[in-house]
Amino acid sequence: MIKTAIIGLGKMGMSHCALLGAHPEVDLVAICDPDGLLQSAFKKLTKFQVYDDYKRMIETEKPEAVFVATPTRFHSEMVLYALERGIHVFCEKPFSLTSEEGEKMVAVAKAKGCVNQVGYHNRFIGTFNEMKRLFAAGVIGTPFHFMGEAYGPVVLKPKGGTWRADKKSGGGCLMDYASHVLNLINYITGSHLTEARGTFMPRIFSKEVDDAIYATLKVESGLQGQLSVCWSDDTHRKMTTSLKIEGDKGKLEADATTLK
């Protein structure tokens, strides 16, 4: 069994806690969160050791793996603290606020021989994996255009009070929503993004962060396409993510449930 701990018990931290707590190959030993109410509840209702300091938790419990599910601005320091001690890390997305932070974490993970996974779940969905296989097999011929989209009803009125409304904490549609689509484009095309042009990031309801992003993108292979993402769209009951790639012999289009 893998001795594991969780840092952060917000929405995603709670989800990971439920999944890891039930996993037959995981020994979830401790959780860490600064919220006193959460600490009290976990002390009363679970067998896990409860901490308000992630460094003390890591030094005391000595886990083999750590799940980091905190606001993005804390990712770098927490991930590096674990990796430098040879602890494997699963980090929620987006990985970091800057490319420099991300590159440093990747370098340390490689040097320490640690797993350092980021929570982009679309990579594990069957339709997207089949799309990747078909694209790599060349079934649509030479690709000439892609369209990556995501829409959902996250911010439908002016509001604040959470880290997602704070740009310095990593809030905003680009970081929180569009990062899923950007990662999917990288994954399926097998080519990293190199350029963005004509970027438009409107604030529809939010005061400090973007509620949508529209841009023309280019990847290393030279393939170009569009990005269209909005988390202030109430025509969708929940987040929907899709990718379309057109080639001179056909077209591939997929979301979480269908491929055509």
Protein language model features and the residues they cover:
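Short, Asp-centered acidic motifs that coordinate Mg2+ and/or phosphate
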Residues: 30, 65, 145, 224
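Beta-loop-alpha module in the N-terminal Rossmann-like domain of NAD(P)-dependent dehydrogenases
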Residues: 16, 49-108
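Predominantly a Rossmann-like dinucleotide-binding segment in NAD(P)-dependent oxidoreductases
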Residues: 122-206
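Contiguous beta-strand/loop segments that form the cofactor/metal-binding neighborhood of enzyme cores
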Residues: 183-258
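Rossmann-fold dehydrogenase core element
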Residues: 103-121, 141-146
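N-terminal Rossmann-like dinucleotide-binding module
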Residues: 1-45
